[in-house]
A protein has these predicted regions:
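A structural signal for alpha-helical segments
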Residues: 11, 54-57, 140
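A solvent-exposed, acidic/Ser-Thr-rich amphipathic alpha-helical stretch
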Residues: 32-128
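Short, cysteine-centered beta-strand-loop-beta hairpins and adjacent loop/turn segments enriched
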Residues: 129-141
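Short, glycine/acidic-rich beta->alpha junctions
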Residues: 15, 104, 142-144
Length: 167
């Protein structure tokens, strides 16, 4: 393989690593409202999102999933403001958005393969994470163990998520 092609593949791998890192940080920072537009493909055929909680096929279904997560964060913020009114007094819901919850998914043991034509790629990551929730029964904390399997597509000069499975 010519040196230029090897360098391009190395750069593609680095861009995909960074894309997934930014995606998981966006989850951690509760930026679900913007995740679809920033990280997901916008033109490729049949994008899908697979999770233990459901399988979402098509642009509308995936957007609806992230919107539902955003609405859940809004609801949780209001609940925390109500339950901890003295500690949150003077703060707006926008300032407190995402508080009380930690959804950390550090990526490890990556495998990234770029297709021969350089237009698609596959990636796999093992995840040992931690989640903290706050609900009507109070705080809950637990470990999560899972795997990301992701197909990427080169679209408009950048790598984008095309199919993502997290189980």
């Amino acid at each position: 393989m010519p040196l230029e092609a090897l360098v391009t593949r190395w750069e593609d791998r680095r861009e995909i690593q960074n894309l997934m890192g930014r995606y998981t940080y966006a989850l951690l920072l509760k930026q679900e409202k913007d995740i679809f537009d920033i990280y997901w493909c916008q033109n490729a055929e049949a994008p899908c999102l697979g999770l233990n909680s459901g399988y979402y096929k098509g642009y509308g279904a995936i957007q609806s999933y992230y919107e539902a997560r955003h609405q859940k964060n809004l609801l949780r913020t209001r609940l925390i403001m109500q339950d901890f009114s003295s500690q949150t007094e003077g703060k707006s819901a926008d300032e407190l958005y995402g508080c009380g919850v930690l959804d950390h998914k550090p990526l490890g043991n990556q495998v990234i393969e770029i297709a021969g034509d350089g237009r698609t790629a596959k990636g796999f990551w093992y995840v040992v994470g931690k989640e903290d929730e706050y609900g009507v029964s109070g705080p809950l904390s637990y470990w999560t163990f899972g795997m990301f399997g992701v197909d990427f597509v080169w679209e408009d000069g950048q790598w984008r998520i095309w199919h993502l499975t997290y189980v």
